[in-house]
Amino acid sequence: MLSLVQKIIGSRNERFIKKVSRIVQKINSLEPEFEKLSDEQLKAKTFEYRERLANGEILDNLLPEAFATVREAGKRTKNMRHYDVQLIGGIVLHQGKVAEMRTGEGKTLVATLPAYLNALTGDGVHVITVNDYLAKRDAELMSDIYEFLGMSVGVIVADLNPQQRKEAYACDITYGTNNEFGFDYLRDNMAYEKEQQVQRSRNYVIIDEVDSILIDEARTPLIISGASDDSSEMYNLFNRLVPYLEKQEKEEVENEQEQRDFYVDEKSKNAYLTEKGYAKIENMLKKEGILEEDDNLYSPHNITKMHYLNACLRAHSLYQLNIDYIVRDQEIVIIDESTGRAMPGRRWSDGLHQAIEAKEGVKVNAENQTMASITFQNFFKLYNKIAGMTGTADTEAFELHSIYGLEVIIIPTNKPMIRKDHHDEIYGSVSEKFDAIVEDIKERISKGQPVLVGTASIEASEVLSTLLKKKKIRHNVLNAKQHEKEASIIAMAGYPDNVTIATNMAGRGTDIILGGNLEVEIAQLEDPTPEDIAQIKAEWLKRNEAVKKAGGLCIIGSERHDSRRIDNQLRGRAARQGDPGESKFYLSMDDNLLRIFASQSMAERVKKGLKGGESLAFGFMSKVISKAQGKVESYHFDIRKNLLEYDNVVNTQRKVIYEQRQSFLEAEDVSDILADIRIDVAEQLFHDYVPAGSMHELWDLEGLEKALKSDFMIELDLQKLYEEDDSLGEEDLKRLVREAIEIEFVEKTKNLDSGAVRQFEKFSLLQSLDTHWREHLSSIDHLRNSINLRGYAQKDPKNEYKKEAFELFSTMLDNFKYEVISSLAKIRIATEEETQRAQQEWQESMSDIKAEHESVIDNNQRHDEDEQEEAPKVQQVRREGPKVKRNDPCPCGSGKKYKQCHSKVE
């Protein structure tokens, strides 16, 4: 019934395209008129549109004319005319939606349309790319269009100083990476002077490769941190002990003789000790003098030892060199699981990175204390309007809509897509699969067809490279180790009979052009003459035609990725702009996806049915693969959703703190703010010793006097005053305390330079707030680590987390107020020069902070904050009931076994 209705009225996507096509017709009708304008008249349009906006006209009304203006500017400056489908893409982006556009459809050019239109307001537009290279490239490519129309263009990259960043953000349109924009936001909220802040309003953002940034990287918070206590000795100790533990092949074993020390769960990327393993590691720790003879690892005070043990166990059993990470310049560099890129600067959390450093024998760096953090989910929600572009978002449409409120619109291609997608071929073993890939490559290059092979790991790319070398097949390898050569390798990938091996092509950002990249070839010529350029073009045309006749670019996938979207990104490299192309995936039953998520019985049946070198290629297996990928995608979605629920608690608090901090920073005079805080502190202090509405017998006036003297340097004999006049009530005494604190401050500052006092007050407010916020993040992190234990008491951990996080936040705000007033009361107010010097010293002490994009650690661990040096000790309680065994049902009521629930090491 639904399909019948869709045939009659069309899908939602089709109806939307039909609706905006009317706007495209309007833009097209303006083209002849705009072609007649002189350059000066066309440039003057920007001023005209801004005038109309100032007079109350809205952007939607300006859209047809503004888009026609950009199209004409593109023709005159770049000899590039926006196609109708690109205009549709621009409208989609302006409306705050996600435009799914195939590879080669010109997303970079599309972004100029909504960027120009929205920059007319003067509030700035941010264009986000996945790396610095693409940010610089896209800004340089499109700057001619923007600057022709009087728009300024800036680029934010990693090596800019604060002044350069400020200038870039002041531009009408600013390009940069998601990391840089996020870190600048955090750094701005750590600044001590308004002039040190570099960003302005977050008005409108266009995110290129939006699925990669908002989904793949949603589990990886941006963190600014400082070093905490050194724990390298403990990591090195456990790294030495873990290899003595024997791996058990599966969770359950038939008898005790088969039991080993630990087993791994590859789905959740976790490792678990068995009872035998616990006993073994305890004995080793006792021999090392780490545990007392009557102590055990289950004791709450050993939670940090469990932290080191679990991290080292996972490092040895689940994370592999050249697959999950590489060692470069004596540092561990993570490999992005989605793109195969090396990610210098990123670190795993929960001690995993330190454990891998110990495993590989490089320097173990200290774990860090979080000073500021935010997830991309919450950072991009700070913008008034979000839009995105990608080649593959439809499979993630539900998540983009449910979390970000973004609707995905599939944009028609300018020319029909004619790629031929072959059935997957499945082999019994990895070696047979690789042999088949080599034979396929050999056959295809014999007819001049270029081949791009996508692998899931560096190890796989190097194995395949070795096999090709044995067959004397010329090829290029593109993976994390060859990151610097990326652009030149991609430029060559479309040459006839060229073979390129790439680790997960997702996010590469460069089109593969059949016959090679003509623009790159011309750019490489030194002072070319018109004849040189004509000759290069003629040679390129021959190669282009030859590759088309050979079938276009062929994509070969060496295995299926966990996500269908990543597979589609790889496929999307072929058949751009109506070119021919092919794609084919080769799999084996030993591939991670099938080994972990397909049923064991089915895998055994398939292996038995295949003789050496034989393969399967039929629809049933495609369903099995699709189902397995669906499981993984659903699993990851739940993790991201769970992360957001937890992070939203901190995000609400972050907004309060940052808004409060900004008000301090922008205020010329904070004396009124401090006056209000003094009233709050006086009331808080008074009720600590004189409970509201209580009888006189419960008053602790002596304690209140001591607190006033020790914390505020105030001598006030309340007991004597009350004895002399017993008619004094609670409110009278409270007023006396409030007045005493106020008078003390006035007396202290009356003979001082008001400018110095105001500056010192502001510095004290900011410094105290930053210190308390940093300590609060640490407390929240510890709370998050231990909150699942509340399941023992039949309580919902999430609700408990929200409740306790709120209590911690309220306490932190009270402590901040109390400390800042107490400090100002006790400290000698400095001169202006002394304040500036103190401020400089404080900022210098913060100079060793690190900006890190924390990496995804696994699917069962927390992801919103960096690790802390030590979890808080828990009060030991005695068990009232019988001991819960590892295979018994968990007492939390989850229905899971105890070892799979609350016995897990957090």
UniProtKB/Swiss-Prot annotation:
Zn(2+) binds at C890, C892, C901, H902. Part of the Sec protein translocase complex. Interacts with the SecYEG preprotein conducting channel. Has a central role in coupling the hydrolysis of ATP to the transfer of proteins into and across the cell membrane, serving both as a receptor for the preprotein-SecB complex and as an ATP-driven molecular motor driving the stepwise translocation of polypeptide chains across the membrane. It comes from Francisella tularensis subsp. tularensis (strain WY96-3418). InterPro entries: Helicase_ATP-bd (IPR014001), Helicase_C-like (IPR001650), P-loop_NTPase (IPR027417), SEC_C_motif (IPR004027), SecA (IPR000185), SecA_CS (IPR020937), SecA_DEAD (IPR011115), SecA_motor_DEAD (IPR014018). ATP binds at Q86, G104, E105, G106, K107, T108, D511. Residues 853-865, 877-888 have a biased composition (Basic and acidic residues). It is an enzyme of class 7 (translocase). May bind 1 zinc ion per subunit. Its EC number is 7.4.2.8. It catalyses: ATP + H2O + cellular proteinSide 1 = ADP + phosphate + cellular proteinSide 2. This is Protein translocase subunit SecA. Belongs to the SecA family. One of its GO terms (molecular function) is metal ion binding. Residues 853-906 are annotated as: Disordered. GO terms for cellular component: cell envelope Sec protein transport complex; cytosol; plasma membrane. CDD domains: DEXDc_SecA (cd17928), SF2_C_secA (cd18803). Keywords: ATP-binding, Cell inner membrane, Cell membrane, Cytoplasm, Membrane, Metal-binding, Nucleotide-binding, Protein transport, Translocase, Translocation, Transport, Zinc.
